[in-house]
Swiss-Prot record:
Lineage of the organism: Bacteria, Pseudomonadati, Pseudomonadota, Alphaproteobacteria, Rhodobacterales
Gene Ontology BP, a term: response to hydroperoxide
Similarity section: Belongs to the UPF0246 family.
GO CC annotation, single: cytosol
Listed InterPro entries: YaaA
Protein name, as recorded: UPF0246 protein SPO0106
Superkingdom of this protein's organism: Bacteria
Organism of origin: Ruegeria pomeroyi (strain ATCC 700808 / DSM 15171 / DSS-3)
């Protein structure tokens, strides 16, 4: 199985003694960064709903974005992202064999880099997939990426001999994957909290659970989609009544 997750807004830029790989869409990232660096502070604030300080930070990041970055300004993607999903993934605690498997089977969808492997070297950035950044290809990043992400995922799935993609990404990011171009069966786990017999999705918990599901798949080297139902991290249990064949639902008592 191939697994996809979203990136994170927050970064952990601690130095890592880990060999990195080059992103498949490095040239596109450079092109997009050059487009973004021409925006005014006001444009950046509006583009991503940023405060003044965050707009300045990300303007400076785009201005400093290197065409051929060295190790001093890059970090491995799965270790650099630090949001809720990555609390569940806990990439830093994966051993070398688990990380090798993740490098083949886990992908991070990115507004700037398109598709990343866990050890791909990224520069510090923030550019959400839903951003309406105008380029020669259109008025949004969805226009920019077109069917490229789908074609890349098809090819990478073919390399590992699978026709199944487990979608642990958010709707914002998986929306960049063109369904008409994608040739894979998509399974989307759903994580819900049961509060008084009324199951509901709580964003913070769901993000962390999606990362935990990705970790579960990596650590067990799962290839059979039916094995996903055995996931029980964080107190979640598979609920057959709420589930559909390609949308397994996991439920736990409300944690609030």
């Amino acid at each position: 199985m191939l697994v996809v997750i979203s990136p994170a807004k927050r970064l952990d830029w601690a130095e890592r003694d880990v060999a990195t790989t080059e992103p498949a869409f490095q040239d596109d990232a450079v092109r997009l960064a050059k487009t973004a660096r021409n925006l005014t502070l006001g444009d950046l604030k509006k583009l991503m709903g940023l405060s003044d300080d965050l707009a300045r930070l990300n303007r400076d990041r785009f201005r400093e974005f290197a065409d051929a970055p060295g190790a001093d300004v890059t970090r491995p993607a799965a270790l650099a992202f630090a949001g809720d999903t990555y609390q569940g993934l806990e990439a830093a605690s994966l051993d070398s064999e688990e990380m090798d498997w993740a490098q083949q089977h886990l992908r991070i969808l990115s507004g700037l880099y398109g598709v990343l492997r866990p050890l791909d070297a990224i520069q510090a950035y923030r550019l959400e997939m839903g951003s309406r950044l105008k380029t020669r290809r259109g008025t949004s990043l969805y226009d920019y990426w077109g069917d490229q992400l789908s074609r890349t995922l098809n090819a990478q799935a073919d390399e590992i001999g699978t026709d199944v993609l487990v979608n642990c990404a958010s709707q914002e990011y998986f929306g960049a994957v063109d369904p008409k171009a994608l040739k894979l069966r998509v399974i989307t786990p759903v994580f819900m909290e049961d509060k008084g017999g009324a199951p509901k999705i709580v964003s913070f918990f769901a993000k962390k659970a999606r990362g935990a599901m990705a970790r579960y798949i990596v650590q067990r080297r799962l290839t059979d989609p039916q094995a996903l139902s055995e996931f029980d991290s964080g107190g979640y249990q598979y609920n057959a009544d709420l589930s559909a064949p390609d949308k397994p639902v996991f439920l736990r008592p409300y944690q609030g």
